[in-house]
Amino acid sequence: MNNSLTIIGAGAWGSALAIALSNKFDKIFLVAKDKANTASLGTQHSALSRSYSQNIFIGHSYEVINNSKAVLIATPSSSFSSVLKSIKNDLNGKPIAWVTKGFDPETGNLLHETFNQYLPEHHPCVISGPTFAAEIVEEKPAAIVVASKDKKTRAYWSDIIQTEKLRAYTNSDIVGVQVGGSVKNVLAIAAGIASGLGFGANTQAALITRGLAEMTRLGVALGADKVTFQGLSGLGDLVLTCSDDLSRNRRFGKELASNISTDDALKNINATVEGFKALKLVMKVARNNQIEMPICEQVLLVTEGKTTPKEAVTELLLRKPSQE
């Protein structure tokens, strides 16, 4: 019986999942973007290199899908549609899910809509939640959400993803789980800005709470259940990403608070900042649906150089008082 898994995307999260799931599969095929990435993985991910000699096989060809029972996409949102286009003829009905967060940058759609465009015969499934890749590799306990409208698909992937250290919950609200996973990255930039400006716990609490309200408003407008945002993929992921410097988005915000340019801040992070990629898309979707997202709006203005971090905070504080 085939007991192999293909993970497409050999960044921090894809690599962490390969390590975490390596005891559950005979083989895990980790597909890197190109040969250059393949050659450098051993030095970039020391924990991965230790597992490589066992049952994690790193390559750059999608042909390994033929030897796998399921496929998990772990690429940035900017690569999501191109990956689907490349593999759609190789799946042959095999289960597929993704851990990618964000909106499709080409269309502004949630990723399950892009998925349905390329793979209409499959049930879309997203896996999301408050998880830092580094802590997953270190086998620190965590919880995650498997979301799909299809009950069998949820059950299948929750069984795959759950380990002794990673607890999987299921949710039928695939829209809400995706919105939470995308918007929290934008709000983490705001939290980083606040931290970089020297503000304290009061400010962080206000940002997280009011940020959650913005996330919920947008999600409900797109058809999500507001209860979803009280769970792991909403509040849980938001608290994690806003509160710890393992978050690239938070670190990016702290860089912006030092009054350097957006380009320089991105260079200093030297890794994918999904919140920055999602920012314009989130605000476009919000405006199209007439949803107020003042915190996210100010983050956008800061990244565009249209206001300073301090001015953004002042603008938020001077807004007309309103009911919570």
Model-derived segments and spans:
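NAD(P)-dependent Rossmann-like dehydrogenase/reductase catalytic/cofactor-binding core
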Residues: A191-G192, V220-Q230, G234, L238-E324
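Rossmann-like NAD(P)(H) cofactor-binding subdomain of soluble oxidoreductases
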Residues: S51-E139, W157-D159
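Internal alpha-helical scaffold of NAD(P)-dependent oxidoreductase catalytic cores
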Residues: D90, T114, Y118-H122, P141-T228
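Alpha-helix C-terminal capping/helix-to-coil transition sites in glycosyltransferase folds
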Residues: N66-N67, V183, L235
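NAD(P)+-binding Rossmann beta1-loop-alpha1 motif at the extreme N-terminus of oxidoreductases
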Residues: M1-H60
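General beta-strand structural signal in soluble alpha/beta enzymes
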Residues: W98, H123-S128, A168-S172, Q230-G231, ...
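Conserved hydrophobic helix-helix packing surfaces used for dimerization/oligomerization
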Residues: S4-L5, I96, I144
